[in-house]
């Protein structure tokens, strides 16, 4: 089978060559902060799991080119014509510039599959609606230099190219330059820093009884069961009405940004403070961002033995009531200060990370769909024809996202979607992660 071709396009110095080196087997391009380092289009072989492709790096495009610029434009145009997919790159630090808008119009006229890649987003990043105005329906946020967000880019590439072959993922090193990023989040003084100190067996992070000691997200690299883990301690998330100081507003923004880039988020709850609506708000935000989540109840050693059973019963009831979208989410009860059940938390993170990356073949999905819809059929329409879901396929992982084709998608109720999602969790062992369904209409309404 002929290899698919992916071309990197963008104005100078947005990080095309850095991403080229990340995706290729060997470093081929020279990387420098000066614009215009790449003068010719460069080719290399790339590979994602079992999916191999040809990757092209192009010269940076600039408006009003001189003679050299015209020749570079010719190089880039040829690379676009050869491409099955274009990664149009912009600089997340500088935002959308006039050249980006002009060049996006130039690229889109070729009607190629495109992904907008917002690069250099290793620090706090405020997503600007201007990015949508560039006209691309698929947007991925990354840092090519630091290896952040690359798997999201890989999944977008697989989705755009409709590659349905199995992508084998090694949990210790899913792709070059990536690691398992675990963010520890929660309300202030839940014991987040103490928990990370317990894992690394070192007083690396400042702790104390005062709420709000951690003011910024702090990263700690760790190795666990041959897995490279980046532990990220965050500032506690308060209700908006209680955030007054400008520094704490910045800290909260930093925490929200860390969650966006996380693979797994540990939501830490103080057993003595009990579960509050703010905890559910944080959990909902994590799920809406599509992250996998573990709920950890800390300070379990301070709860009276006679009260623990009733506490757990009420806690599970609250979780199932307020967070039905992550049915079966792992819940662990620990004492960070006594290092009780710490390894169980890390084991749960490894397990749910694997589920979050799960890829189900189209054949298995449609056998399951046929069986499930026969057990509980969709309703009849007023015209007498039954609403049907004819076919489905997985369009991405992280979180698992599925496209379902129906003769009348508008008639599929939320309750029926919940039925399908919950049945899928049981059938494919996908408990505790967000699962997303999107419905599209069949071209033929009578099937």
From Swiss-Prot:
GO biological process, one term: ribosome biogenesis
InterPro entries (alphabetical): G_ENGA (IPR031166), GTP-bd (IPR006073), GTPase_Der (IPR016484), KH_dom-like (IPR032859), KH_dom-like_a/b (IPR015946), P-loop_NTPase (IPR027417), Small_GTP-bd (IPR005225)
Binding-site residues, GTP 2: 186-193, 233-237, 298-301
Listed GO MF terms: GTP binding
KH-like domain location: 358-443
Domain of life from the UniProt record: Bacteria
Keyword GTP-binding (UniProt): yes
Gene3D superfamilies cross-referenced by the UniProt entry: 3.30.300.20, P-loop containing nucleotide triphosphate hydrolases
Residue intervals of the EngA-type G domain: 4-165, 180-357
Keywords annotated in UniProt: GTP-binding, Nucleotide-binding, Repeat, Ribosome biogenesis
Residues noted as binding GTP 1 in the record, renumbered to the chain: 10-17, 57-61, 119-122
Entry keyword annotation includes Nucleotide-binding: yes
Subunit structure: Associates with the 50S ribosomal subunit.
Function statement: GTPase that plays an essential role in the late steps of ribosome biogenesis.
Family according to the record: Belongs to the TRAFAC class TrmE-Era-EngA-EngB-Septin-like GTPase superfamily. EngA (Der) GTPase family.
UniProt-recorded name of the protein: GTPase Der
Source species of the chain: Rickettsia prowazekii (strain Madrid E)
Gene coding for it: der
């Amino acid at each position: 089978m002929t290899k698919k071709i992916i071309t990197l396009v963008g104005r100078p110095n947005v990080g095309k060559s850095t991403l080229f080196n990340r995706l290729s087997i060997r470093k081929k391009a020279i990387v420098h902060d000066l614009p215009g380092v790449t003068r010719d289009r460069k080719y290399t072989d790339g590979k994602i799991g079992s999916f191999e492709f040809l990757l092209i790096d192009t010269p940076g495009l600039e408006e009003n080119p001189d003679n050299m610029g015209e020749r570079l434009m010719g190089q880039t145009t040829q690379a676009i014509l050869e491409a099955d997919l274009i990664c149009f790159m912009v600089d997340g630090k500088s935002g959308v510039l006039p050249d980006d808008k002009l060049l996006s119009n130039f690229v889109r006229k070729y009607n190629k599959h495109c992904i907008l890649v917002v690069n250099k987003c290793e620090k706090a990043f405020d997503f600007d609606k201007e990015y949508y105005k560039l006209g691309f329906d698929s947007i991925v946020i990354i840092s090519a230099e630091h290896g952040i967000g690359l798997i999201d880019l890989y999944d977008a590439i697989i989705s755009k190219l409709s590659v349905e072959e199995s992508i084998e993922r090694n949990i210790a090193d899913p792709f070059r330059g990536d690691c398992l990023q675990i963010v520890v989040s929660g309300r202030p003084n839940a014991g987040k820093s103490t928990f990370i100190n317990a894992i690394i067996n070192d007083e690396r992070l400042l702790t104390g009884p005062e709420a709000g000691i951690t003011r910024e997200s702090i990263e700690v690299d760790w190795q666990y069961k041959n897995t490279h883990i980046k532990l990220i301690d965050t500032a506690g998330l308060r209700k908006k009405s209680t955030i007054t100081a400008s520094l704490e507003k910045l800290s909260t923004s930093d925490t929200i940004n860390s969650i966006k880039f996380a693979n797994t988020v540990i939501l830490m709850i103080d057993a003595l403070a009990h579960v509050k609506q703010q905890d559910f708000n944080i959990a909902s935000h994590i799920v809406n961002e599509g992250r996998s989540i573990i709920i950890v109840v800390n300070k379990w050693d301070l709860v009276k033995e006679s009260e623990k059973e009733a506490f757990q019963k009420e806690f599970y009831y609250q979780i199932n009531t307020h967070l039905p979208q992550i049915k079966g989410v792992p819940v662990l009860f620990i004492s960070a200060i006594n290092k009780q059940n710490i390894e169980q938390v890390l084991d749960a993170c490894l397990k749910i990370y694997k589920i979050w990356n799960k890829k189900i073949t189209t054949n298995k999905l449609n056998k399951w769909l046929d069986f499930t819809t026969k057990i509980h059929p969709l309703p009849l329409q007023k015209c007498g024809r039954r609403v049907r879901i004819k076919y489905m396929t997985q369009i991405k992982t992280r979180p698992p996202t599925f496209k379902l084709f129906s003769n009348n998608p508008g008639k599929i109720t939320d309750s029926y979607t919940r039925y399908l999602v919950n049945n899928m969790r049981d059938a494919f062992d996908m408990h505790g992660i967000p699962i997303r369904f999107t419905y599209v209409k069949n071209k033929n309404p009578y099937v």
